[in-house]
Amino acid sequence: MLIEILLLAGAYLLGSIPTGLLLAKAAGVDIRTTGSGNIGATNVYRTLGRSVGIATLVGDCLKGLIPVLAAKYLGMTDLWIALAGLAAFLGHVYTVFLGFKGGKGVATALGVFLGLAPLAVLIALGIFVAVVATSRYISLGSITAAAAMPPVVAFLSGRPPLVGVTVVIALLVIWKHRENIQRLRAGTENRFKA
């Protein structure tokens, strides 16, 4: 049990590393005061360009993937594997390093799900791409893909710990997008420009 607790603590701390903030600071920008003010890959991309945005996406994704792979490598049960992913995700959205104010969690959730349910990620990614291609709203694509994950994971795996954690992560991703939802409804949300 000690190893599992240490893994969860490590996963949370890894998830708490504010990748976008650190990369933006290295470029001389405080991302929290630029664009949307969010520390995630979309705002970094819009503010600092493709390369820094992609680096943020990859870094945030790895924060979710590494703890899941570590738990699998250590031979932990589905419950602990799923909790390791959840801990990393919670670290990102409620980072201890920024007063528990983090990002929206999309990229970190992607990493978690790549480790937990890679086939479900492919389906959700297809949904994300279709929504963004037709609407040009990254936020709408993220919300729709998050909403699709629980039923897809339930259908493909049916394993209660994975489904439970997927529901929690999906709900939190949608909750973290509540301001985007308001802007979408008001017609003031920023569209994606490639």
Swiss-Prot record:
It comes from the Bacteria. It catalyses: an acyl phosphate + sn-glycerol 3-phosphate = a 1-acyl-sn-glycero-3-phosphate + phosphate. Keywords: Cell inner membrane, Cell membrane, Lipid biosynthesis, Lipid metabolism, Membrane, Phospholipid biosynthesis, Phospholipid metabolism, Transferase, Transmembrane, Transmembrane helix. It comes from Geobacter metallireducens (strain ATCC 53774 / DSM 7210 / GS-15). Catalyzes the transfer of an acyl group from acyl-phosphate (acyl-PO(4)) to glycerol-3-phosphate (G3P) to form lysophosphatidic acid (LPA). This enzyme utilizes acyl-phosphate as fatty acyl donor, but not acyl-CoA or acyl-ACP. Pathway: Lipid metabolism; phospholipid metabolism. NCBIfam families: glycerol-3-phosphate 1-O-acyltransferase PlsY. Belongs to the PlsY family. One of its GO terms (biological process) is phospholipid biosynthetic process. One of its GO terms (molecular function) is acyl-phosphate glycerol-3-phosphate acyltransferase activity. The chain crosses the membrane at residues 2-22, 51-71, 80-100, 112-132, 155-175. It is an enzyme of class 2 (transferase). Coiled coil: none annotated. This is Glycerol-3-phosphate acyltransferase. Its main location: membrane. It is a multi-pass membrane protein. It is found in: Cell inner membrane.
